[in-house]
From Swiss-Prot:
InterPro entries from the UniProt entry: KOW, NGN, NGN-like_dom, NGN_dom_sf, NusG-like, Rib_uL2_dom2, Transcrpt_antiterm_NusG, Transcrpt_antiterm_NusG_bac_CS
SUPFAM superfamilies, per database record: N-utilization substance G protein NusG, N-terminal domain, Translation proteins SH3-like domain
Signal sequence, start to end: none
Role noted for this protein: Participates in transcription elongation, termination and antitermination.
Swiss-Prot/TrEMBL keywords: Transcription, Transcription antitermination, Transcription regulation, Transcription termination
GO biological process, one term: transcription antitermination
Annotated GO CC locations: cytosol
Protein name: Transcription termination/antitermination protein NusG
Pfam families (UniProt xref): NusG (PF02357)
CDD domains: KOW_NusG, NGN_Bact_1
Family: Belongs to the NusG family.
HAMAP family, per database record: NusG (MF_00948)
Organism: Helicobacter pylori (strain ATCC 700392 / 26695) (Campylobacter pylori)
Length: 176
């Protein structure tokens, strides 16, 4: 019977584990027992210091691969022994199938991919430090964040007065 299982992997190795499982299925002629292997991802926007943007993929569930498989003990041990596989998720060291609700939520999240999100997000009222431009080294409060144009409207305190400024989000850093 085909069920969904979660496999814990080394973080960042999800795609290589997926490929290793596909190779295992092809090499051992068991492709009919493995119906689907997924690594849910989302698109994010990364901005370099020179304000160049690129869209990259990031795993929604770092360190996990989901597999729909007709699992028996032999296949379980073969998959478990693949490089970068930590374990199947389950109780008492035995794999436990995911519930329909859990896998439904994962698949829905994967299928409802929105527009790429910025890697760094600023919230209204957040305090940031300006790192470039005439207001470098000033602290400011975020009033508005325009994700599409990657601009921030900030309030900077200059000589005791709040002064509104608008700058690119690459010109500020979060204060931790």
């Amino acid at each position: 019977m085909m069920d969904w299982y979660a496999i814990q992997t080394y973080s960042g190795s999800e795609q290589s584990v997926k490929k290793a499982i596909e190779n295992l299925a092809n090499d051992h002629n068991i492709r009919d027992r493995i119906q689907e292997i997924i690594v849910p991802t989302e698109d994010i926007i990364e901005v370099s210091k020179k304000s160049k943007t690129k869209v990259t993929e990031r795993s929604l569930y770092p360190g996990y691969v989901f597999i729909k498989v007709d699992l028996d003990t032999v296949l379980w041990h073969k998959i478990q022994s693949l490089p970068r596989v930590s374990r199947f998720i389950g109780e008492n060291k035995k794999p436990t199938p995911l519930s329909e609700a859990d896998i439904g939520h994962i698949l829905e999240k994967m299928n409802n991919r929105a527009a790429p999100k910025p890697k760094i997000f600023f919230e209204q009222g957040e305090v940031v430090r300006v790192v470039e431009g005439p207001f470098a080294n000033f602290t400011a409060t975020v009033e508005e964040y325009d994700v599409e144009h990657r601009k921030l409207k900030l309030n900077v305190s200059i000589f005791g007065r709040n002064t509104p400024i608008e700058i690119l989000h690459s010109q500020v850093e979060k204060i931790i």
